[in-house]
C-alpha cells in the first residue's frame, strides 16, 4: 500500500520534471548576438524598399524626356514649313525679267561703268598732280631714272589717270547694283544664261585671219534680241567661210 503510493508520487515528480525541462526558456534579448542578428534582418528588409523607391523616383524623370523626344519632330516640321514659306515668298517677290529688259539693264550698267571710269580718272589725275607738284622731281628723276623732270611728271600723271580709269568700273558696278538692287537676282540669272549661250554658239577662233575675222567672240556688242540674232548669223557665216576655205 505504501509502496504503491510512493511509486505514484515518484511518477508524478518525474513527469513534472520532464515537462519543465521541455518547456522553452525565454531568449535573452539583451545579448549582443541577438542585437546583431536583429540589425542584419532589418537591413535585408530595408533593401528592396530603397530600390522600389528609387524606381518610383526614376520613373517620373523619364517622362519629360519622352515628351521632348516626341515633340522635337513637331518643332522641326514647323520650322521647315516656316523656312519653306519664307523661301516661297522671296521667290515670289523676285520680278521676272525678259530679254529686252535684260539688254537694257546691261547697257545701263555699261554706261555707269564708263561714266565712273571717266570721273575716277579725272579725280585721280588731279590728286596725283597736286601731290607730285609738292615733290622734288628734278632730284627724283636724276637719282632713279636719269630722266628729265617734265618726263617724270608726265609719266606720273598718266599713271594716276590709268589707276583711276581701272578703278572706275568697280565703283560704277557697285553704284549700279545699289540703284537696281531689285532686279539683281533676275539679272544675274539672265546673265548666266546669256553667257552660256555665247559659249555654246560662238565659233572656234583657231582659224582666224584678216579675210575672215572672228565676229564678236565675247558678245559685247549685243544690245538687243535682234542684235543676238544677227550675232548668230555672223557665227554661221564665219563657219561657212571656214568650211569652204575662203580665208
Swiss-Prot record:
Alphabetical UniProt keywords: Membrane, Mitochondrion, Mitochondrion inner membrane, Protein transport, Transit peptide, Translocation, Transmembrane, Transmembrane helix, Transport
Transmembrane segments annotated in the record for this chain: 112-132, 150-170
Compartments, as annotated in UniProt: Mitochondrion inner membrane
Topology in the lipid bilayer: Multi-pass membrane protein
GO biological process, one term: protein import into mitochondrial matrix
Transit peptide (first-last residue): 1-49
Primary location group: mitochondrion
UniProt-listed InterPro entries: Pam17
Domain of life where this protein originates: Eukaryota
A GO-annotated cellular component: PAM complex, Tim23 associated import motor
Function of the molecule: Component of the PAM complex, a complex required for the translocation of transit peptide-containing proteins from the inner membrane into the mitochondrial matrix in an ATP-dependent manner.
Subunit structure: Component of the PAM complex, at least composed of mtHsp70, MGE1/mgeA, tim44, PAM16/pamP, PAM17/pamQ and PAM18/pamR.
Stated family: Belongs to the PAM17 family.
Protein name: Presequence translocated-associated motor subunit pam17, mitochondrial
Species per Swiss-Prot/TrEMBL record: Aspergillus fumigatus (strain ATCC MYA-4609 / CBS 101355 / FGSC A1100 / Af293)
Organismal lineage: Eukaryota, Fungi, Dikarya, Ascomycota, Pezizomycotina
Gene: pam17
